[in-house]
């Protein structure tokens, strides 16, 4: 995270958290602006020893499902648009996002498929309301491919090729979704 922040990365670092844990996780980001300011005031070792204020923990769902990722191979939005979207983030958006992340974790731990689908869909709607530019045509195709299947999908990430993620609740739906994503390119 330190190196990415130093290079001006705008992301939540959720991708790094997933890579570090190699698991389905609950992740709440640190205050990136606060850490950037600390980077200018203290050396690396001191900064790394400090509490960055993030939360991360593995989630063990009580429901069998596949976690699928479809990569668009193209950024959803440019760095300028990322900054515009970032400036549009309101306390209401952040509160709504936190509410959905917490509800999703609870639903996963309880094995409540309907609540999982509802939370993912509401999180997707929050992103779309924040900026329609987030859902490029390719991301819309990835998301819409899940409709009518026993799964739910949403956009995830911004940068060098955005992703659609999906939770699929049966093998047939997983196979159909993967095929639809492959056919879409």
Give the role of each language-model region.
Residues 2-10, 14-158, 165-185:
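C-terminal nucleotide
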